[in-house]
């Protein structure tokens, strides 16, 4: 069985890795959708699809997991979004998602929809990790070592800090 899991992975963290490991025990192959692939260089989505692809592939090469990592673009037309995903991915029967809209869209198309159990959401949150990066707090322990290396390679911390700068002084 092949399943689909979509996320923004901004950045890919240990909670994401645990979810993928659990799903891989249930299915033969996982399609890891890199959602909102067109977004980057914002505080919410600082990393490009290619950078997120590196984070995922460099991490998962250390595990016996059969997967495809595929960029998925937002089309802002919910009624046809599932068809867009289908055109970009190998066939699959099951989707894992915590997003209620995505669950609804795939349910309406008769997919088996499962909600993955989040892993230690208190610590493993992309929002919290990006905030720690911005503040200069320790964040490296929250992501796989390979992700730390990718973020260092692309100078991701300084990118996030530059993105947070105001364009002018407020009076």
Swiss-Prot record:
Keywords of this entry: ATP-binding, Cytoplasm, NAD, Nucleotide-binding, Nucleotidyltransferase, Pyridine nucleotide biosynthesis, Transferase
Catalytic activity field: beta-nicotinamide D-ribonucleotide + ATP + H(+) = diphosphate + NAD(+)
Domain of life: Archaea
A GO-annotated cellular component: cytoplasm
The EC number(s) this enzyme carries: 2.7.7.1
An example Gene Ontology molecular-function term: nicotinamide-nucleotide adenylyltransferase activity
A GO biological-process term: NAD biosynthetic process
Localization (cell): Cytoplasm
UniProt cross-references to InterPro entries, sorted A to Z: Cyt_trans-like, NMN_Atrans_arc, Rossmann-like_a/b/a_fold
Pathway(s) annotated for this protein in UniProt: Cofactor biosynthesis; NAD(+) biosynthesis; NAD(+) from nicotinamide D-ribonucleotide: step 1/1
Gene3D superfamilies according to UniProt: HUPs
Record HAMAP family: NMN_adenylyltr
NCBIfam families referenced in this protein's UniProt entry, alphabetically: arch_NMN_Atrans (TIGR01527), cyt_tran_rel (TIGR00125), PRK01153.1 (NF002243)
Entry's family note: Belongs to the archaeal NMN adenylyltransferase family.
Protein name: Nicotinamide-nucleotide adenylyltransferase
Organism: Methanococcus maripaludis (strain DSM 14266 / JCM 13030 / NBRC 101832 / S2 / LL)
